[in-house]
Curated annotation (Swiss-Prot):
The lineage of its organism: Bacteria, Pseudomonadati, Campylobacterota, Epsilonproteobacteria, Nautiliales. It is found in: Cytoplasm. Pathway: Amino-acid biosynthesis; L-arginine biosynthesis; N(2)-acetyl-L-ornithine from L-glutamate: step 2/4. CDD domains: AAK_NAGK-C. This is Acetylglutamate kinase. Keywords: Amino-acid biosynthesis, Arginine biosynthesis, ATP-binding, Cytoplasm, Kinase, Nucleotide-binding, Transferase. It comes from Nautilia profundicola (strain ATCC BAA-1463 / DSM 18972 / AmH). The record marks K29, K237 as: Transition state stabilizer. PANTHER family: N-ACETYLGLUTAMATE SYNTHASE (PTHR23342), N-ACETYLGLUTAMATE SYNTHASE, MITOCHONDRIAL (PTHR23342:SF0). The keyword Chloroplast does not apply. It is an enzyme of class 2 (transferase). Catalyzes the ATP-dependent phosphorylation of N-acetyl-L-glutamate.
Length: 280
């Protein structure tokens, strides 16, 4: 009986957060270990289904860089990075789209639908809802997003699962590979999402003593970047989070995707588990 009481108490504790997010859109960048480990995949699917069933509208933007590198290596196609950004060539853009849209996207959609959700897989070429220009080679910089298209899918009670491939400027253009963190940030702003969550392989933003910083503002982030506390691979994630907040998303969250049910723990508990980023 005590266990049943504790279960009910947990549900009641989450009620204020469910009420706050009911009918609101949450964009989730899905990547890292959470996208590879079978146990974490299952946890992720259950979290998304939970949000969906209580009236919250999840949108998933996924990466797939490791898998793309594996396929390129197997095909003896050289992989080059410039300032931490993959240089996508005319040859590798076709492989990137094959992996992101044809393999990973379909796997996520199937996983969610097997759990009872109504997910649909798309990329930026569908309705040309996400367009880009060249940043370096066929790695792109987003120029426009049709938020109406994504919101239409949400209004039909669908969960959009978005592969970060953007349309080019002509019918024959092969498209652009987009950084998934950037895509999640830009999509969140374009569809007026309430929150954007980045799943990572770190607890969040850490101070110099390797302790989690639970909350950061724009001003605090700039100071931490200047003194080297925020460095390396965390810089683009923080920049993407901050970009979303600057464009109207209420808060961004950088959380540890290696923890089971990390999304629910961040959104539906008072303490959260990661770093929340707000403008001020």
């Amino acid at each position: 009986m005590q266990k049943k009481i504790e279960t009910v108490k947990t549900l009641l504790d989450s009620l204020p957060f469910i009420r706050k997010f009911y009918g609101k859109t949450i964009v989730i960048k899905y990547g890292g270990s959470a996208q590879i480990d079978e146990r974490l995949k299952e946890s992720f699917a259950i979290d998304i289904l939970m949000l969906y069933m209580v009236g919250i509208k999840p949108v998933i933007v996924h990466g797939g860089g490791k898998r793309i590198t594996e396929i390129l290596t197997a095909l003896n196609v050289k992989t080059e990075f410039k300032d931490g950004v993959r240089v996508t060539t005319a040859e590798s853009i076709k492989i990137a789209e094959m992996v992101l849209s044809g393999e990973i996207n379909k796997e996520i959609v199937n996983m969610l639908n097997q759990h009872g959700a109504k997910a649909i897989g798309i990329n930026g070429k569908d309705m040309s809802f996400m367009k880009a220009k060249s940043l370096v080679g066929y790695t792109g910089e987003i120029t426009s997003i049709d938020g109406v298209f994504v919101n239409k899918l949400l209004s039909e009670s669908l969960i959009p699962v978005i592969a970060p491939i953007a349309a080019g400027d002509s019918a024959t253009h092969p498209g652009y590979n987009i950084n998934a963190d950037t895509a999640a940030s830009e999509i969140a702003a374009a569809i007026d999402a309430k929150r954007v969550i980045f799943l990572t392989d770190t607890p969040g933003v850490l101070d110099k003593g390797k302790n989690l910083i639970s909350s950061l503002t724009k001003e605090e982030i700039e100071k931490l970047k200047q003194d080297g506390t925020i460095a390396g691979g965390m810089i683009p994630k923080v920049d993407a989070a901050l970009r979303a907040v600057e464009r109207g998303v209420e808060k961004a969250h950088i959380i540890d995707g290696r923890i089971e049910h990390s999304i629910l723990l961040e959104l539906l508990t008072s303490e959260g588990i990661g770093t929340e980023i707000k403008e001020s």
